UniProtKB/Swiss-Prot annotation:
Record function comment: Catalyzes the pyruvoyl-dependent decarboxylation of aspartate to produce beta-alanine.
Protein name in UniProt: Aspartate 1-decarboxylase
GO BP annotations listed: alanine biosynthetic process; pantothenate biosynthetic process
Classification via NCBIfam families: panD
Organism: Neisseria meningitidis serogroup B (strain ATCC BAA-335 / MC58)
Assembly behavior: Heterooctamer of four alpha and four beta subunits.
InterPro entries (alphabetical): Asp_de-COase-like_dom_sf (IPR009010), Asp_decarbox (IPR003190)
Family as reported in the entry's similarity comment: Belongs to the PanD family.
Modified residues (Pyruvic acid (Ser)): 25
GO molecular-function terms, A-Z: aspartate 1-decarboxylase activity
CDD domains listed in its UniProt record: Asp_decarbox
Gene field: panD
Note on how the cofactor is bound: Binds 1 pyruvoyl group covalently per subunit.
EC top class, as a word: lyase
Length: 127
């Protein structure tokens, strides 16, 4: 049996752009993708902390060190520049793999620069 588990997360990133006329997806600074173990074109879930919207799309690698978080296409209707989002990828793991699995949780500052990388979130943690 396989279970769907958190693979990587970019926690509380600030939306820098929203481009309605782009074909689709989310553009993310390549440094953030690497740190979270998320690949270009990988399916991700997005949560908008400002309005509660949850949606799925895929990633496009943005310029390294740019801090870019840009929602493209229809997803641009669900965010505004300055909104705080959580970007999550998931992995399929077998029961034996679960015990050794540690997700990569990337904590960022207000400029989308890496503040810390953790693998465990205790209950009721405020980050």
């Amino acid at each position: 049996m396989f279970r769907t588990m958190l693979g990587g997360k970019i926690h509380r990133a600030t939306v820098t752009e929203a481009d309605l006329n782009y074909v689709g997806s989310i553009t993310v600074d390549q440094d953030l993708l690497d740190a979270a173990g998320i690949y270009p074109n990988e399916k991700v879930a997005i949560v908008n902390n400002n309005n509660g919207e949850r949606f799925e799309t895929y990633t496009i690698a943005g310029k390294r060190g740019s801090g870019v978080i840009c929602l493209n296409g229809a997803a641009a209707r669900l965010v505004q520049k300055g909104d705080i989002v959580i970007i999550m990828s998931y992995v399929q793991l077998s029961e034996p793999e679960i015990a050794a699995h540690e997700p990569k949780v990337v904590l960022v500052d207000g400029n989308n620069k890496i503040r810390d990388i953790i693998s465990y979130e205790p209950p009721h943690t405020v980050l």
